[in-house]
Swiss-Prot record:
Keyword set includes Nucleotide-binding: no
Protein name per UniProt: Uncharacterized acyltransferase YDR018C
Family recorded in the similarity comment: Belongs to the 1-acyl-sn-glycerol-3-phosphate acyltransferase family.
PANTHER family: 1-ACYLGLYCEROL-3-PHOSPHATE ACYLTRANSFERASE-RELATED, LYSOCARDIOLIPIN ACYLTRANSFERASE 1
GO molecular function: acyltransferase activity; lysophosphatidic acid acyltransferase activity
GO cellular component, one term: mitochondria-associated endoplasmic reticulum membrane contact site
Length: 396
């Protein structure tokens, strides 16, 4: 494994000790987030009014609004929490960037992404991985049902077609089935989007690709959730399972998703996330809360990802218990990866060479501040233009 390059920038809160200036900075960040989110929601409303007749164009517009939201979040993070982002991945084939010969990671167009859940900002960093894979507009996230009622954001997330669950399988099964079947059919050009000649936009970008982000642990790691997880292990006679840095994963929802998406699914990615500086005895979700990250500038200096790819034919779906044991094995390997991470400050590969050459590569980057600001400004301008067209149409 190559050692990551040194990368350190400072957020706006770290550049001044003046409380008044910091207060103005917090106000700036809040205004930027609210105005950006509002422009995205108004843009979505315009799409609903102006493009109800074209499902392809409407979906492309929704995908663009998804991209705008993750660009907005990344631009704000670049200002307040400019972490070094280190992506380490296993591959049995060379992956090349179009601009140079160095290997670079990219999610496949139709994939499920599973990860350990340490803090509430995990999903932002995973969405960023999809964004740099040119799939930022094709992300789907499974969330708590209560989140769909958040003012402004809830409306936007419902338009994003995020999946909201109540953690009651009898209630959730139908909603989950409808969402997954629709994603699968559209990806295979057999769904609602196939009333048209192509499932691709003029730029040949897949309208119906999907990156489904799931957290099998169900919640983020904390003292309370750890105690609940250990109590469940005892009740389920899983006392032999000793996870030092993770919670026991739930397999039912993941197996259901894999089965429903199997006809179109390209790969399942297992992403292990590590944050530093953090001690093995600390709970990252307590140390780096959303409030601390966005309003106080308390953030991880490094965010490390270790990514493994599983092909669908490698996943045992024939039996619930066999699938759970497979997932548990993946989680034990993740736990060892995190143990090595806390010992050495970087992920150490435990890849096995089974008749193929496994290459482990690390790439270090940031939030690419040189391109984020022009991009979000272009989104603002485009949204403002479309809103103006909408207003003029209503007046006439």
């Amino acid at each position: 494994m190559k050692h990551s390059q040194k990368y350190r920038r400072y957020g706006i809160y770290e550049k001044t000790g003046n409380p008044f200036i910091k207060g103005l900075q917090r106000l700036l960040i809040a205004c930027l987030f609210i105005s950006g989110s509002l422009s995205i929601v108004v843009f979505q409303i315009c799409l609903q009014v102006l493009l109800p007749w074209s499902k392809i164009r409407f979906q492309n517009g929704i995908n663009q609004s998804k991209k705008a939201f993750i660009v907005l979040l990344c631009m704000i993070l670049n200002m307040v929490a400019p972490s070094s982002l280190n992506v380490t991945f296993e591959t049995s084939r060379p992956l090349k960037n179009s601009s140079n010969a160095k290997p670079c990671f990219r999610f496949k167009d139709r994939a499920i992404i599973i990860a350990n859940h340490q803090m509430y900002a995990d999903w932002i960093y995973l969405w960023w991985l999809s964004f740099v894979s040119n799939l930022g507009g094709n992300v789907y996230i499974i969330l708590k049902k209560a989140l769909q009622y958040i003012p402004l954001l809830g409306f936007g997330m419902r338009n994003f077609k995020f999946i909201f669950l109540s953690r009651n399988w009898q209630k959730d099964e139908k909603a989950l089935t409808n969402s997954l079947v629709s994603m699968d059919l559209n990806a295979r050009c057999k769904g609602p989007l196939t009333n048209y000649k192509s499932c691709y936009s003029k730029t040949n970008e897949s309208i119906a690709a999907y990156n489904l982000i799931m957290f099998p642990e169900g919640t983020n790691l904390s003292l309370k959730t750890r105690e609940k997880s250990e109590a469940f292990c005892q009740r389920a006679h899983l006392d032999h399972v000793q996870l030092r840095h993770l919670l026991l994963p739930h397999s039912k929802g993941l197996k259901f998703a894999v089965e429903k998406l199997a006809p179109s699914l390209d790969a399942i990615y297992d992403v292990t996330i590590g944050y530093s500086p953090a001690l093995r005895t600390e709970y990252v979700g307590t140390k780096f809360t959303l409030k601390k990250i966005f309003l106080m500038g308390v953030y991880p200096e490094k965010v490390d990802f270790y990514i493994r790819e599983f092909r669908v034919n490698e996943i045992p779906l024939q039996d619930d218990e066999v699938f759970f044991n497979w997932l548990l094995g993946v989680w034990k390997e993740k736990d060892q990866l995190l143990e090595d991470y806390y010992n050495t400050g970087q992920f150490k590969s435990n890849a096995k060479n089974d008749n193929q050459s496994i290459v482990v590569t690390t790439q270090t980057t940031g939030f690419q501040h040189e391109t984020l600001t022009p991009r979000i400004l272009s989104y603002y301008g485009f949204f403002a233009f479309l809103i103006l067209v909408f207003v003029m149409k209503k007046n006439h």
